[in-house]
Amino acid sequence: MIALLFLLASTACSQDDNVTETEPDLVARARGIHERVITLDTHNDISTANFTADRNYTMALSTQVNLPNMEAGGFDVSWMVVFVGQGDLTPERYGDAHRQALAKFEAVHLLTEQIAPDRIELALTSDDVRRIIAAGKKVAMIGVENAYPIGTDLSNIELFHEMGARYMSLAHNGHSQFADSNTGERDEVWLHGGLSELGRKAIAEMNRLGIMIDLSHPSKESNMQALALTRAPVIASHSAARAVGDVSRNLDDEQLMALKENGGV
């Protein structure tokens, strides 16, 4: 939406200064842009409670994202997020988190394969996105926020890939088994000094499979190390510029320049 507003402003400024566009004119221009380009949201948190036969995204729920809103707003691609909050680094808690993550994967598959396959489809590649949109449907993609549910068994990364994950962050609000979180700035207590050895191995596996590394939430040191290691472009799915919003989970100029050099977004 920010990009759209910027484009509208840029376009309006290029017009004759003596020509004033009315609000209906601007709305029509915005709708025209939506009809010509693929619009996407790279981070849509979901609840499994909204993926049931009685309550789901075919309905006008109070959620920001649902099919009626997507269709009315000309919104094409929703990255639905498999998120499990950070817990203790123990086998028991890894198992609990893994089960919660699988339930969210299954919720997205339920929506796209059983509840509304005629209106929305899961995409695994950019070619899928174009094909689905050409067929007149909306697109779901899956990102993983916090690799904590992987546990210490890196074969779970391949399982998540098979279930549709195409990006994953290595930490959230709290240090994970893979990487330090930005939240370490609160007390300057760090667990790994960036990435753990397991985190370095996870990056190699994600590169092999084709899962983008998400820089949103890990610490600066974790992100800089990830950018140095990765062989593929990364994503900051829901971050802002720290120079504008000075909070620890935003990216400072050094990280943004490294992101540029990486070819990521």
Predicted regions and their residues:
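Short hydrophobic transmembrane-like helices used for membrane targeting/insertion
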Residues: M1-I2, V19
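Catalytic pocket-lining loop regions of alpha/beta-barrel enzymes
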Residues: L198-V265
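N-terminal hydrophobic targeting/anchoring segments and the immediately downstream early-domain regions
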Residues: C13-W190, D246-V265
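Bacterial N-terminal signal peptides
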Residues: I2-S10
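Cysteine protease catalytic core and zymogen-processing segment of caspase-like enzymes
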Residues: G194-L195
